[in-house]
Structure formats: C-alpha cells, structure tokens
Amino acid sequence: MALYQGAAFFMLVASCVCSTVFHREQQTWFEGVFLSSMCPVNVSAGTLYGIMFDAGSTGTRIHVYTFVQKVPDNTGQLPVLEGEIFDSVKPGLSAFVDQPKQGAETVQELLEVAKDSIPPSHWKRTPVVLKATAGLRLLPEEKAEALLFEVKEIFKKSPFLVPDDSVSIMDGSYEGILAWVTVNFLTGQLHGHNQETVGTLDLGGASTQITFLPQFEKTLEQTPRDYLTSFEMFNSTYKLYTHSYLGFGLKAARLATLGALETAGIDGYTFRSACLPRWLEAEWIFGGVKYQYGGNQEAGEVGFEPCYAEVLRVVQGKLHQPDEVQRGSFYAFSYYYDRAVDTDMIDYEKGGVLKVEDFERKAREVCDNLENFTSGSPFLCMDLSYITALLKDGFGFASSTVLQLTKKVNNIETGWALGATFHLLQSLGISH
C-alpha cells in the first residue's frame, strides 16, 4: 500500500490552505500541488503539463492538465492546478481486440489534442501515460497486451516524454481510491481535520466502484479485509472502504441481463428481455463482439416489474452491503450521471441532486411505456432498472439516500485521472 500512502494521496495534503508550511526534513511528493481556485496565482510562474489517457470499456479519454509552478527561489509557494483540456473518442480500445493497430490510431487522434493544447517548447518534458480499466481487464491477456504494445509504439513516435511504464492496465481498487480522493479534494471536503468526506460511486461500462471513509467501528469490523485500504496523513490514519466489481458496469450488466455475458455471441440467436420494446430486433457490439437482441415478441411480459426481476438476478446477493451507506453522502458519476441526463432528471452542465428512489420512479415511467418507444437508446429501461437494483439491492442504499450527480467539479472532470497525473509528475521528479 506504499503507493496509496505516498503517491496517490498527495491531493489530500493539497487541500489545505495556501499558507500551510510543512515541517518535515524531506518533503513528500504529495505536498506539491494546489488547486488554483483555492490558491490564486499572483506572482510570476512557470507552467508544466501532464497528459493522462483513460482507456475505458466504452471509449478512450484524454486529460491534459496544466499546472503553474512558482519561481524556484520563491520556496514558500507551491505549484497550482490551473485547468484541464478534455476530449474523447468512441469506441474503446477493447472494441479493436483483433485490430490493435487500428485501436492505437484512436489514441493518435487524441494526441493531436495534446499537441494543440501544449506549447511545443514543453513537449519534451511533458509526460504521457495511458491507463486502461475494466474493458481491457476482461480481454484475454495476449489480446490486451497486443493493444497496449501498439499504443506504446504510438507514444514513442510522439514528441512527448514517454516513461517506461507509460501504458498499463490499472487495478480496479486504485480506480476507486483515486476517484474518491479527487472528488473530496476538488469539493474541499478534506480541508481541516474533521474528516467530513463524501463517498463516491463510479459506474463504468464493464466495472463499478464504491469508495467511502467509514465513520463507525462496526463497518470496519464487518467488512472483508480486502475491501479496506489504510494510509497515513498529518499523523492521522485513514481507512477507506473501497471495492471494484468487474462485470457489474452498465454495459456488462446488459449482457448479464440478456444472458449473454458468458458467450461470445451466437450466430442466428437473439437474446431477449422484458426490458426492451416488444417489437425490437437489433444488433449491438460490445468488446468487439456482435450480439443480436430484441424484445419479448409474443407471450412474454414487458414493463418495469418483469424487467426488474431480470436485473435483480444480476446483483442480488453478489455485492457486499455495508450498513453505513444508508446514512452517508455520495457523489455519483459516469453512467449514473449520463442516464440521469438522458431522462432529464438533471441538467447536463450543472448536474443535480437525486434520491435513489428517483431512479426507480424514472425506470417505472420508461419501462411501463415501452410500447410507445420511438427514439433514444432501446436499453434505457434496462439501464435505469439496473441502476436502481445496483443501488438498492446491490449496495444496499435506502430509497431516500441522496446522491450528488456530477460530471465536473471546479471545471475538472471527476474520476481517477487527476490523481494519477499527480503521481506521474512526482514519480518523474517534475512536480517540484
């Protein structure tokens, strides 16, 4: 856990007031960056950059972060995070499982965004890294390695700094921890010593993560040991509850609901569900595999109740349920956010606050009107029902639990990429 104790958690320290003075013989790497909105830049400064690729199951995203570093002799001042350039492409790398060179070309396309965003004079000292998540974890190892090799070749041809470990598959728990740190840092929840933090819920295409700081000893006692991660900061020990569930992301859950998760797609066979419009006949490609799917055309039921029964089988009894989540505050993002936007429950730009029961209410509304479905995603009923089941019957949230749905905080994307970039800069000795 040395990585978590040092590398990933420098942002926790960074959330202190700007005038903080560190009394240590050796400054650890996480003492070096502050968010510019918290610590305005009023002196001459140098600029540095970091490029982080998030290779998810449904798309590849690039984050270009800009930092400002005060002049070297101004030792009382520390670098600040100035902003982020974000872009993405679809589908994800896993869709190119048998065409690795073609998959790497999508990364090349996004590298042009970095070149346009960073002055040429900084290219040689700007590190570029790609971390893949659940989409590549689900692939056979040799297939995933072939994709990563081609991406590394693209990086080597770029004008940027390419570390030895520039391309890798990230552990799911690392994903959850860094997302928790990022959200709590950006929202200012880690200021001071009261440890009043928020939990985080991340719903990707192939996996989902839940992370929070337990407040009750009972939670620690009843939680499996591999769900807890400890680290130290300011002479205090933090113990996070965090777990990543591979195969429980939104897209993987569709396959599980259809009964297609363990298959490679069967020619001529159509997977059917009560969660889909009765007349629907369609094809869907996920992870480079084509699936035929449709509704219950004749005697089969459709609507919320039969649909919920289908998605319930995917999650019931398969996830750990800490009692404490019913009383906690949580930020939810990724597909939680996207589906709430798709159904006009929240504003795309501002996000919003929802209760778990709001997802169930919207699921009932959509599913019980499948016969009138005309546009949008045919999976909307299934997705909303799955989100409801995941929250209530999977994680054990109460219907009244309030969730903050957000995509950005202080104009910075939520998720793990910011923390990973901080770690990258320090590991290369760039952040000071």
Swiss-Prot record:
The keyword RNA-binding does not apply. N-glycosylated; high-mannose type. InterPro entries: GDA1_CD39_NTPase. The active site is at 175 (proton acceptor). Disulfide bonds join 275-307, 367-381. Glycans are attached at residues 235, 372. Its main location: endoplasmic reticulum. One of its GO terms (biological process) is UDP-alpha-D-glucose metabolic process. It catalyses: a ribonucleoside 5'-diphosphate + H2O = a ribonucleoside 5'-phosphate + phosphate + H(+); GDP + H2O = GMP + phosphate + H(+); UDP + H2O = UMP + phosphate + H(+); IDP + H2O = IMP + phosphate + H(+). Keywords: Calcium, Disulfide bond, Endoplasmic reticulum, Glycoprotein, Hydrolase, Magnesium, Secreted, Signal. Belongs to the GDA1/CD39 NTPase family. This is Ectonucleoside triphosphate diphosphohydrolase 5. It comes from Bos taurus (Bovine). The gene is ENTPD5.
